[in-house]
Curated annotation (Swiss-Prot):
This is Large ribosomal subunit protein uL14. Signal peptide: none annotated. Binds to 23S rRNA. Forms part of two intersubunit bridges in the 70S ribosome. Keywords: Ribonucleoprotein, Ribosomal protein, RNA-binding, rRNA-binding. The gene is rplN. The keyword ATP-binding does not apply. Part of the 50S ribosomal subunit. Forms a cluster with proteins L3 and L19. In the 70S ribosome, L14 and L19 interact and together make contacts with the 16S rRNA in bridges B5 and B8. GO terms for cellular component: large ribosomal subunit. GO terms for molecular function: large ribosomal subunit rRNA binding; structural constituent of ribosome. The lineage of its organism: Bacteria, Pseudomonadati, Acidobacteriota, Terriglobia, Terriglobales. NCBIfam families: rplN_bact. InterPro entries: Ribosomal_uL14, Ribosomal_uL14_bac-type, Ribosomal_uL14_CS, Ribosomal_uL14_sf. It comes from the Bacteria. GO terms for biological process: translation.
Length: 123
């Protein structure tokens, strides 16, 4: 099932947001479910007071970790402890300047190279 509507996501960057609630995945054909590397719209539910993202704003984010396992083409599975996302702007660049925690290799295939380069570990 991956990440569905109204799922709470941790924020894996230093944009100022701490928790997001997924509103809807962007792009056609996905229904109401988002997988690793998908772009979603989300509402900021918790934010730090000095960050750029404010509570109550609607933002775009890319899913970088999911608790539901994801099957890769070689038959292996990847699963994380949390559901997490990184905030992006309209051009697809990350809003924050740092990414915390590991991210999935699928982001490289979906052309989020800046997020992959900022991440401390790519699994």
């Amino acid at each position: 099932m991956a990440v569905q509507m109204r799922t709470m996501l941790e924020v894996a960057d230093n944009s100022g947001a701490r928790k997001l609630q997924m509103i809807n995945p962007l792009g056609g054909g996905a229904g109401h479910v988002a997988h690793l590397g998908d772009v979603v719209t989300a509402a900021v539910k918790e934010a730090s007071p000095d960050g750029t993202a404010k509570k109550g704003t609607v933002v775009k984010a890319v899913i970088v970790r999911t608790h539901k396992e994801h099957r890769r083409k070689d038959g292996t599975y990847i699963r994380f402890d949390t559901n997490a996302a990184v905030l992006i702007n309209d051009t697809g660049e990350p809003v924050g300047t740092r990414v915390f925690g590991p991210v999935a290799r699928e982001l490289r295939e979906k052309k989020f190279l800046k997020i992959v380069s900022l991440a401390p570990e790519v699994l």
